[in-house]
Amino acid sequence: MGLPKSAYKKLLIDCPTRVINKNCAQRVKDVSPLITNFEKWSDKRKKLYFKDEEEMVGHFHLENFNLKNNLYGRLLASPMRAEKISKLKSCRELLIPLKVVPSTGKDQHADKDKLKLVPTLDYSKSYKSSYVLNSASIVQDNLAAATSWFPISVLQTSTPKSLEVDSSTFITEYNANLHAFIKARLSVIPNVGPSSINRVLLICDKRKTPPIEIQVVSHGKGLPITQSVFNLGYLHEPTLEAIVSKDAVTKGIYLDADNDKDLIKHLYSTLLFQSVN
């Protein structure tokens, strides 16, 4: 015995609203793995950004290591870049930046079809660049494969014959540029003396002393402070030795690590470049 039509109508149309899910018409938001699992598939760590880091340190009673005032902390805090020899990432300030420029022939005219890779002192976004380890001995051992140091974008769009690296002048050119920059800055920079707390002392000692040394010395009322000592005698550059040794009283030049950041960075790069690995 079948149900009357009125019963069907009541079941299909006049269904009580309490049995209907009001949210059934809403579409579930798509959750992309690009957002939820980005750090897993991209091999990148999560980063936390704070508007005011000093306020966070004080509010949560965190220990402040004052890395902003630390010479080596600033070097290690530079952006990470992949370098071409070891294929590993390192701090940008510990590498040699290379730039791509048009190659010039014997007539000193640029050849648009040829590109040359040369070392430079500072990174710039105005040209295509890559990086290699800041070590003269390692660079010398790998100069035979120097054309592979070009940026990937250049290697993909150029033929091997159009890429050039002058292996005979590569190391000497970079070294000469570093020395010229340091000489120019040291000849005009003031000697702050041992009064500066955050300081770097430049000396010229040809004995078997390390090129870079950290010393603990007394300051003011006998309070101990640390200072970095850069031994430019390690470079065997007579002009630099004369500049550093001209003050017989202090027997060196004191630099302010806060105001002379650029000069100190290039001094560190020079000593690192010529150090024996």
Swiss-Prot record:
It comes from Saccharomyces cerevisiae (strain RM11-1a). InterPro entries: Rrg8 (IPR031415). GO terms for biological process: mitochondrial genome maintenance. This is Required for respiratory growth protein 8, mitochondrial. It comes from the Eukaryota. It is found in: Mitochondrion. Required for respiratory activity and maintenance and expression of the mitochondrial genome. Its main location: mitochondrion. One of its GO terms (cellular component) is mitochondrion. Pfam families: RRG8. The gene is RRG8. Keywords: Mitochondrion. Belongs to the RRG8 family.
